[in-house]
Amino acid sequence: MKPLIALVGRPNVGKSTLFNRILRERAAIVDSTPGVTRDRHISEGFWQGRAFRLMDTGGYAPEDGVISNAMLEQTMTAINDADIVVFVADARAGLSYDDLELAKVLRQRFSHKPVFFAVNKVESPQLAYEAASFVSTGYTEPWCISAKDGSGVADLLDAILLEMPESDADQEEDGAIRLAVVGRPNVGKSSFVNALLGNNRQIVSDIPGTTRDAIDTRFTRNQQDFLLIDTAGLRKRTKISAGIEYYSSLRSEKAIERCEVVMVMIDAGPGIEKQDLKIINMATERKRAVLLLVNKWDLIEKDSKTSKQYEDTLRSHMGNLAYVPVLFISALTKKNLYRAIDTAREIRDNRARKISTSALNRFLEEALAANPPSSKGGTELKIKYMTQIQAAWPVFAFFCNNPELVQTNFRKFLENRLREKFDLKGVTISLRFLQK
């Protein structure tokens, strides 16, 4: 993951203006009304060739009403998740009680994190002089900046760059298969993990959203190491409040980015819903392999045909995602728990497999014989050969006379045949057509 920089401070100190200045775009709403930024805003930025994620947060105002309390929770969670914190104050408004309180929290609870204290709106020598009063926060060397005109921002970013950690993408390449357990709240993710590991490692209750953090657990099965990431439930965006729940959802998305196989869990009772499909899409968009786990299967009245009928109904709702394998489990009775892990390992191994060019071209010859591509505009598509490109997921290159002649149905045909031929169920694959 790219390092995360969080902008925190009271409402209306200029965090959103600084956010936009750093990103050189108006990505956040800027308004003179305190507290306009109630939700988080996260975008990717670059400075001196280094990439990072920048987070704008709602204002820290602990003495105000319910909304501000949610914004306070948001600020605390943002600080906890961030690699670097930029604490923003307002030179025009002067030092406030809330500034002192936030400074106290940062020094006492987050002393292990790099904190840059930026006094914003310093747009005159007089304001620069008055900014000296902010040393009473305990930060004796505040950065005097103006997010509005950009003065001091480059120097601040240069200093931040020196504290910025390297991306941790390469730090997890230790041979362990990385699995993420994701799904809507209260579908049984933590019960699944606890049953699998044989301990009550997490609080399990009927209250949706009990698990707020993404929690990593290592275990070994059949001499293979696994890293299991259990996450907070992913709700619809419209149901995510302005506080801690959004950040729980953010952690789930981060877990998907970190893993190789996403185990999407649904509740057998209500079945698959739009949000489940969005979660699967989120995983496939990030080119992750996917396994669909139907939990609480023990609660379903069934006969010998039930699982087949249920799976058929699932796939009818999944459309282009119908290639995702389905496994019926019960965290309560431990039905198919280890089979889920073994299946995830098999999917991951297939995702990492390199298929020889000779095998691919034999496949291509058979596929073209079975379903020759139709012509387009009187011109016939001619595919000369194919190969697999080196990537973290299977990417297949087809060399042809004109890539624009490739029609959607034919592309889908090749994708389906590749999955069948080379056992790529659950694996996101990419097809690229290149002119030769």
Curated annotation (Swiss-Prot):
Residues 3-168, 177-352 form the EngA-type G domain. It comes from the Bacteria. SUPFAM superfamilies: P-loop containing nucleoside triphosphate hydrolases. One of its GO terms (biological process) is ribosome biogenesis. GO terms for molecular function: GTP binding. Residues 353-436 form the KH-like domain. The keyword Repeat applies. GTP 1 binds at residues 9-16, 56-60, 120-123. InterPro entries: G_ENGA, GTP-bd, GTPase_Der, KH_dom-like, KH_dom-like_a/b, P-loop_NTPase, Small_GTP-bd. Pfam families: KH_dom-like, MMR_HSR1. Keywords: GTP-binding, Nucleotide-binding, Repeat, Ribosome biogenesis. The keyword Nucleotide-binding applies. PROSITE patterns: G_ENGA (PS51712). GTP 2 binds at residues 183-190, 230-234, 295-298. GTPase that plays an essential role in the late steps of ribosome biogenesis. Associates with the 50S ribosomal subunit. Belongs to the TRAFAC class TrmE-Era-EngA-EngB-Septin-like GTPase superfamily. EngA (Der) GTPase family. This is GTPase Der. It comes from Chlorobium phaeovibrioides (strain DSM 265 / 1930) (Prosthecochloris vibrioformis (strain DSM 265)).
